[in-house]
């Protein structure tokens, strides 16, 4: 339970903005209360809200984050990663021109079936070389995503994370889209490729 909460707080791809002030808050749950307003810095220019969810049946953890965003990150809008073993990492990003943005609610997980494609599956914390399992892609998931990065904290220090799994399309996420805390969050690998089609044995 605690590990899922930590992972939720790690995967926040947000950025500060220019000539704008936005509400800043972070909380486990569907929403976060008002914490403080912070002036954003170049090159980002919009306020935004990120909703994150990690669901590993039967457990589900959600977190909410308001911060300053870059327009390039706002275009990402959402992501859904099937990391295998009935585990999903999902995010919804909503940007606006106001200090306080209201995020869009999560839709329910689709009742989809395996489609014959597979990807390496990892939802790893504290290591960029976490053990892989096979993620059986479902529905329209035909791409494999691989994201590796580091979260730098005073304690316990650098925290590595590694996400691999099935996605329906490759997100417009590049190494240049680093988080607002460049000294604290380092996105070092983003790869996306076609999933492997498994041929049924005769």
Swiss-Prot record:
Function: Inhibits the enzymatic activity of all phospholipase A2 (PA2) groups.
Residues annotated as glycosylated: 177
Summary of subunit composition and partner proteins: Heterodimer of subunit A and subunit B.
Localization: Secreted
Signal peptide as annotated in the record: 1-19
Keyword Signal: yes
InterPro entries linked to this entry: CNF-like_PLA2_Inhibitor (IPR050918), LY6_UPA_recep-like (IPR016054), PLipase_A2-inh_b-type (IPR016338), PLipase_A2_inh_N (IPR004126), Snake_toxin-like_sf (IPR045860)
Protein name stated in the entry: Phospholipase A2 inhibitor gamma subunit A
GO molecular function: phospholipase A2 inhibitor activity
GO cellular component, as recorded: extracellular region
Tissue-by-tissue expression: Expressed by the liver. Not expressed in esophagus, stomach, pancreas, spleen, gall bladder, small intestine, rectum, kidney, trachea, lung, testis and body fat.
Posttranslational mods: N-glycosylated.
Keyword Chaperone: no
Disulfide bond entries: 22-47, 25-32, 40-68, 74-95, 96-101, 119-144, 137-166, 170-192
Organism: Elaphe quadrivirgata (Japanese four-lined ratsnake)
Similarity field: Belongs to the CNF-like-inhibitor family.
PANTHER family hit by this protein: LY6/PLAUR DOMAIN-CONTAINING PROTEIN 8, LY6_PLAUR DOMAIN CONTAINING 9
Major location category of this protein: secreted
Pfam family, one: PLA2_inh
